[in-house]
UniProtKB/Swiss-Prot annotation:
One of its GO terms (cellular component) is axon. The modification Phosphothreonine is found at residue 59. Residues 104-359 form the Tyrosine-protein phosphatase domain. Phosphorylation at Ser-49 by PKA deactivates PTPN5. Phosphorylation at Thr-59 and Ser-72 by MAPKs stabilizes the phosphatase, dephosphorylation of these sites results in ubiquitin-mediated degradation of the active phosphatase. The keyword Iron-sulfur does not apply. PROSITE patterns: TYR_PHOSPHATASE_1, TYR_PHOSPHATASE_2, TYR_PHOSPHATASE_PTP. May regulate the activity of several effector molecules involved in synaptic plasticity and neuronal cell survival, including MAPKs, Src family kinases and NMDA receptors. It holds the Pfam family Y_phosphatase. One of its GO terms (biological process) is positive regulation of long-term synaptic potentiation. This is Tyrosine-protein phosphatase non-receptor type 5. Belongs to the protein-tyrosine phosphatase family. Non-receptor class subfamily. InterPro entries: Prot-tyrosine_phosphatase-like, PTP_cat, Tyr_Pase_AS, Tyr_Pase_cat, Tyr_Pase_dom, Tyr_Pase_KIM-con. The active site is at 300 (phosphocysteine intermediate).
Length: 369
């Protein structure tokens, strides 16, 4: 069935253009799990001598070229920065900052990426479990699958992290990569294990290259003893909602799968209302689960860029409603503590600011009525 969502978010300002020398995370798929490279366009020219900054933004584990996880002053203080950085914005400050791409860019590059050194994982066969071989789950917060064989660490591995929510609440979300063929069963094992009521998918199946395998059935499939049945598909302008039932033995659960289709290929959206609508829909669905909702799974392709934008927007919307202020910098740092690289580019960081500026204006309009 086709439903139309009323566009009650007034997009008063277009998303400002990001300067062309923005840093772009260039993820290039290969036949097997893939690699990530970073193109730094004009970064050194803009900031002068910044060797440590270049090291932080480089692909982790690329020591052959003299970059990556080499010790630098920036890296030594990265953990402290992620724990302490904060910039509380009131309404007027938020609106001004959202329109200043140079200020946002400078702030973005101060935030350590907190990627994981691949050498931290010594698990044979791990390459088959990762879509991108340099985007790995931070060990302290990673999801561990229940395994019948404790001697086989690969069977408990999935590229996913628990993510804290508003006010540091534990395990509100799970950020994960888009499943590949070899991890579809693992993905559904995680859904069942974590009792997940909601999945948010923010990628197309292909965008020049494959970004995610189609891991849900047309009608019904069984994975690891869990019967997965699509009961209904609802099409809206910006997303598709699948109502799915999960059954194992006599236990049956409901699952809502939101597939956001309005994120354009290779860039960020030029309008914020579609994402704000999705955030609101997911919040309302989570509230229906009661005060102790199990983790919401969010994924794109690598599980850090668009995934980070969605989770940051959701957290910051809650903060604006409850406190009347927002701290996007602190939220980004919290996300990167839990999973490295969350909110992947300057352009995405700017988009989150624009979305929050728009959301604050909408809240102000509602309060004045």
């Amino acid at each position: 069935m086709e439903e139309k969502v009323e566009d009650d978010f007034l997009d008063l300002d277009a998303v400002p253009e990001t300067p062309v020398f923005d840093c772009v995370m260039d993820i290039k798929p290969e036949a097997d799990p893939t690699s990530l490279t970073v193109k730094s366009m004009g970064l050194q020219e803009r900031r002068g001598s910044n060797v440590s900054l270049t090291l932080d933004m480089c692909t982790p584990g690329c020591n052959e070229e003299g970059f990556g996880y080499l010790v630098s002053p920036r890296e030594e203080s990265a953990h402290e920065y992620l724990l302490s950085a904060s910039r509380v914005l009131r309404a007027e400050e938020l609106h001004e900052k959202a329109l200043d791409p140079f200020l946002l860019q400078a702030e973005f590059f101060e935030i350590p990426m907190n990627f994981v050194d691949p050498k931290e994982y010594d698990i044979p066969g791990l390459v088959r479990k990762n879509r991108y071989k340099t985007i790995l789950p931070n060990p302290h917060s990673r999801v561990r699958l229940t395994s019948p064989d404790p001697e086989d660490p690969l069977s408990s591995y999935i590229n996913a992290n628990y993510i804290r929510g508003y006010n540091g609440e534990e395990k509100v979300y799970i950020a994960t990569q888009g499943p590949i063929v070899s991890t579809v069963v693992d993905f559904w094992r995680m859904v069942w294990q974590e009792r997940t009521p909601i999945i948010v998918m923010i990628t197309n199946i292909e965008e020049m290259n494959e970004k995610c395998t189609e891991y849900w059935p047309e009608e019904q499939v069984v994975h690891d003893g869990v019967e997965i049945t699509v009961q209904k598909v609802i099409h809206t302008e910006d997303y598709r909602l699948r109502l799915i039932s999960l059954r194992r033995g006599t236990e049956e659960r409901g699952l809502k799968h939101y597939w956001f289709t309005s994120w354009p290929d290779q860039k960020t959206p030029d309008r914020a209302p579609p994402l704000l609508h999705l955030v609101r829909e997911v919040e309302e669905a989570a509230q229906q689960e009661g005060p102790h909702c199990s983790p919401i799974i969010v994924h794109c392709s690598a599980g850090i860029g668009r995934t980070g934008c969605f989770i940051a927007t959701s957290i910051c919307c809650q903060q604006l409603r409850r406190e009347g202020v927002v701290d996007i910098l602190k939220t980004t740092c919290q996300l990167r503590q839990d999973r490295g690289g969350m909110i992947q580019t300057c352009e995405q960081y700017q988009f989150v600011h624009h979305a929050m500026s728009l959301y604050e204006k909408q809240l102000s309009l509602q309060s004045s009525e």
